[in-house]
Regions:
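A short, basic/flexible loop-to-alpha-helix module at the beginning of a structural domain
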Residues: 1-14, 120-121
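Glycine-rich adenosine-cofactor-binding loop
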Residues: 10-33, 164-176
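Residue-level detector of alpha-helix initiation sites
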Residues: 26-27, 91, 137
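NAD(P)-binding Rossmann-fold cofactor-contacting core
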Residues: 30, 38-58
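Glycine-rich, highly charged phosphate/nucleotide-binding loops
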Residues: 60-76
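ADP-ribose/adenylate-binding Rossmann-like module
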Residues: 82-88, 93-119
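E1/E1-like adenylate-forming module used to activate ubiquitin-like modifiers
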Residues: 106-159
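An accessory alpha-helical subdomain
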Residues: 137-195
């Protein structure tokens, strides 16, 4: 269906998965920075013939990041769960995409939506609240602007609200349906109080 985003958002526990990034330039820096900002303990291997100093500095701050300054080899994919390609080599991207498809490994290819299994959306984090924004690969700039807007709009005490809701949830007795009913009433009254 045209005009509808059919992507399904998923929040991955990257500290439990092995991620490979291929590319050590500006785009590689953007990808690894985004992953580490959201998941500081992410297990990442970055392979590139040349790795920017900014990436090396970032890796130095994160012990779960391994850098390999050499040419990428197809066997680098071995035992990886998620692949991110951040090079400008379309032929390499197509070769790797074909291989990952045969192995059921998820892949993202920077600025190449037709080769992607998933997109890296724009992420808003306020304490334990995390919101992902996707434009279905059409405009990362719009996703970025939405992120900026939501970061400003969400209250700084969002985490306090979440902690309070967890306490209420933990105290509610009854079956699942009863808990949902009570939590809906609590959040509904909170939203009415904000109007």
């Amino acid at each position: 269906m045209e005009g509808r985003n059919n992507l399904f958002p998923v929040f991955l526990k990257l500290e439990m998965l092995e991620t490979l990034i291929v590319g050590g330039g500006h785009v590689g820096l953007e990808k690894i920075s985004g992953l580490l900002k959201s998941s500081p303990g992410a297990k990442i291997t970055l392979v590139a013939r040349h790795i920017q100093d900014d990436i090396k500095a970032l890796a130095h701050q994160h012990p779960s990041v391994r850098l390999q300054e050499r040419n990428f080899r197809l066997w680098d994919i071995w035992n990886k769960d998620v692949i991110i390609l951040a090079t400008n080599d379309r032929k390499l991207h197509e070769t790797v995409r074909e291989f990952t498809r045969s192995k059921n490994i998820l892949i993202n290819v920077a600025d190449t939506p037709d080769l992607c299994d998933f997109y890296l959306g724009s992420i808003i984090t306020k304490g334990n609240l995390k919101i992902g924004v996707s434009t279905n690969g059409k405009s990362p700039t719009i996703a970025k602007r939405m992120r900026e807007y939501l970061e400003e709009a969400l209250p700084e005490d969002t985490n306090v609200l979440l902690d309070n809701m967890q306490k209420i949830r933990d105290q509610i007795k009854g079956d699942f349906n009863e808990k949902v009913k009570v939590l809906n009433e609590v959040t509904s009254s909170w939203l009415k109080g904000k109007e």
